[in-house]
Amino acid sequence: MLAPLCTRCGAPTVWPVERCIECAGRRLAFASARAAVHYAGPAKAVVRAWKERGVRPLAALAADLVVAHVPRPAADVITYIPPDGDRSRRRGHQPAAGLARELALRWDLPAARLLTRVRRVGRQTGLPLEERRRNIRGAFGAVGRVHGTVVLVDDVYTTGATVTAASSALSAAGARAVHVVTFARTIR
């Protein structure tokens, strides 16, 4: 995504700001968030094909676009948003995990499964921001102690509710900082 961006959440802004209207006043558990592309048009079609139709090679394409548009965060490890078990079984793959593996190769970072779902969550699609936050709060737990700075990968940043909940779990487990990287971002 083209600058200027909010330094914190990565939302497009008219001029560079430390905290934009989207993240000002919110407690964000991550240090920064960046996305390669706007979630619209062709990017939306790519995500749908990748997630719902299982076109796994699109993870490599998405990783190439991320590397081209997102500076590599200074980090010790890369991880991903763990999928809902039912959706993962139905799809037969884990899109965020695939993107994390591809980025780990390109950024020469170790990839690790640092998070797990500790409770089931209803679908987030179509929910307003406050409902998304309530729905996802407390849904993630760390697999063990987390050391150093973490890159947290997901396919799409919509409201930040999912990555905030996951970042909270990583921080509670010892992460020094969490930098969120997604393929696409919804612009509100």
Regions found by a protein language model. Name each.
Residues 1-188:
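Glycine-rich phosphate/pyrophosphate-handling loop used in enzymes and phosphotransfer proteins
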